[in-house]
Design a protein with these regions (language model features):
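The feature captures the beta-strand-to-loop junction immediately N-terminal to the Walker
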Residues: 44-46
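Helix-to-loop junction immediately C-terminal to a conserved catalytic motif
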Residues: 59
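Conserved ABC transporter NBD signature motif
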Residues: 67-79
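Hydrophobic anchor residue at the start of the ABC signature
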Residues: 86, 150
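Short coil-to-helix segment of the ABC ATPase nucleotide-binding domain corresponding to the Q-loop/switch region
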Residues: 96-104
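Conserved ABC ATPase "signature" region
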Residues: 103, 107, 112-132, 184
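Conserved signature/switch motifs of ABC ATPase nucleotide-binding domains
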Residues: 135-138, 156
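Catalytic Walker B motif of ABC-type/P-loop ATPase nucleotide-binding domains
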Residues: 161-164
Length: 259
């Protein structure tokens, strides 16, 4: 019998509570999740189900109230370059150019100048921003800014890319184009991606596995392998069948909570 694969990320019985105006808010309750190296996993659920909280715990920005988050079996206690975060609002330095935003991580880590420069140029080209390397964030479209944010994480030598609804504020055409580009980058780099979304179609289109979370407090309701071949056609009967199944799983539990 084969040995089980060691997960790159493991969430063990994680609960998280917050204090808000004198009340205790249960954001997560006994969450368990294993993510293998190279997987693309999407987290989906209604607002307030703890998706972003779970992502922040994996990033090291938040600590669990109980349970533990692990990377390669070692406790996650603080942010580290191995886990890079991409936010919906880009989180770029407005006073730095595209090139300097991407160079910030390697430079801060003491990477030799020539090596850092080569790394930056590699990822600038990978995200298609070679012509805009000297531009500033305010001179870029939303989609271009998000490409910079992705390149910045990649240039910092991340093994795990954590994405918190990164395309949620973009128009439909730009969002679809960036989904395709993200899958191309993932295929080339073999990185592990954990992607938060509230859109069922986006979750199915991108993921190896779609993890459904439920609110009040947030729990892992189901973990669903996506068996659709890549590249995926959102207009195909197979995709629509999967969308109906996933929609049913998502909304049936929410209906029970509301009843």
């Amino acid at each position: 019998m084969a040995e089980p694969t060691l997960p790159i990320i493991e969430i063990r019985n994680v609960s998280k509570t917050f204090q808000l105006q004198g009340q205790t808010i249960d954001a997560l309750k006994d969450a368990n999740l294993r993510i293998n190296q190279g997987e693309f996993v999407t987290l989906i659920g209604a607002s307030g189900c703890g998706k972003s909280t779970l992502l922040r715990i994996i990033a090291g920005f938040e600590k669990p109230t109980s349970g533990e988050a692990l990377m390669w079996s070692k406790p996650i206690t603080e942010p580290e370059p191995q886990r890079g975060m991409v936010f919906q609002d880009y989180a770029l330095f407005p006073w730095l150019s595209v090139r300097d935003n991407i160079a910030f991580g390697p430079t801060s880590r003491g990477v030799p100048r020539a090596q850092a420069r080569a790394t930056v140029e590699h990822f600038v080209d990978m995200v298609g921003l070679g012509r805009f390397a000297d531009a500033y964030p305010h001179q870029l479209s939303g989609g271009m800014r998000q490409r910079v944010a992705i390149a910045r994480v990649l240039a910092n030598d991340a093994e795990v890319v954590l994405m918190d609804e990164p395309f949620g504020a973009l128009d439909a055409m730009t969002r679809e184009r960036l989904q395709e580009e993200l899958l191309e980058i993932w295929a080339r780099t073999k990185l592990t991606v954990v992607f938060v979304t509230h859109a069922i179609e986006e979750a199915i289109f991108l993921a190896d596995r779609v993890v459904v979370m439920t609110p009040g407090p947030g729990r892992i309701e189901s973990d669903n392998p996506m068996l659709l071949a890549r590249p995926r056609d959102i207009a195909s009967p197979e995709f629509n069948d999967t969308r109906r199944v996933m929609s049913g799983k998502l909304h049936s539990h929410h209906g029970k909570k509301a009843a």
